[in-house]
Amino acid sequence: EIFDLDTIMQRLHASIVNNPSAKAAVDMAVYDLYAKTLGQPLYKILGGAKQKIETAHTISAKPTDEMLRDSLQAVQDGFGILNVSAGKQALKDVENLLAIRKAVGPGIRIRIEADQCWSPQEAVRIISTLEDKGMQAELVEQPVKAHDLTGLKFVTQHVQTPIVADESIFSMKDALHIIQTQSADLINIKLMKTGGIHEALKICTVAETYGVDCMIGCMLESKISVSAAAHLAAAKNCITMVDLI
């Protein structure tokens, strides 16, 4: 029975340990069938909060001139938010980010994807330097290793720029721990990490309870899973940031 979602999802998540991407594929198919059976788009069934969402455009870590070219092209294409990837060279990261800010101007929102590249102390030093130089980054994603929650909290407590937990969160329990310990300011939800929409909705409920905003992102995925993420983003008011390109 397609309307017995809880039972279906309990069986799905009990069927195998880990493998969240495989679970997500089944989860999304179930929710798609659920919505089609009701004759409504999925985002309306899940909450229907928004008619429009705005995604950031990812700028991959490359030589400075290539990152500048990609950033300017994204702005020319109409993107108002850039998600800029960092590397493993602190001075080069600072140089690249400041060069991009200067090139695109103050009207473009810039988010920093640190991708676990820095130590806690290095992260504080880099982010503080960027703050002092007027970078005005909207946020920094996962500045330290996913398992280093003590380090994540250290960074969050020592900088002004909001810190996002990404790879540190796979489940509602992970999100609850991060929020209760104030280890990060924001939560990044990815359906390939959570095992699909069902667990992502639980994370949204926790975030809403504590008044914490969420971002929704993606990995290297098909348009099917990215579309599912877009529906979830449109459904929930707690998802205030989108990074699906």
Question: Each predicted region: which residue ranges?
Answer:
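Active-site beta->alpha loop and helix N-cap motifs at the rims of alpha/beta catalytic domains
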Residues: 40, 57-69, 73, 90-94
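Catalytic core of soluble alpha/beta enzymes
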Residues: 84-225
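Metal- or metallocofactor-binding catalytic centers and their adjacent structured scaffolds
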Residues: 1-37
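Flexible C-terminal active-site loop/helix
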Residues: 219-245
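A generic structural signal for well-ordered alpha-helical segments
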Residues: 34-35, 156, 207, 233
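Flexible, glycine/charged-enriched surface loops at secondary-structure junctions
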Residues: 2-6, 41-45, 137-143, 218-219
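Gly-rich Lys/Arg/Thr-decorated short loops/hinges at beta-loop-alpha junctions or inter-strand turns
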Residues: 50-55, 74-81
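N-terminal small/glycine-rich loop or linker at the start of catalytic domains
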Residues: 36-61, 96
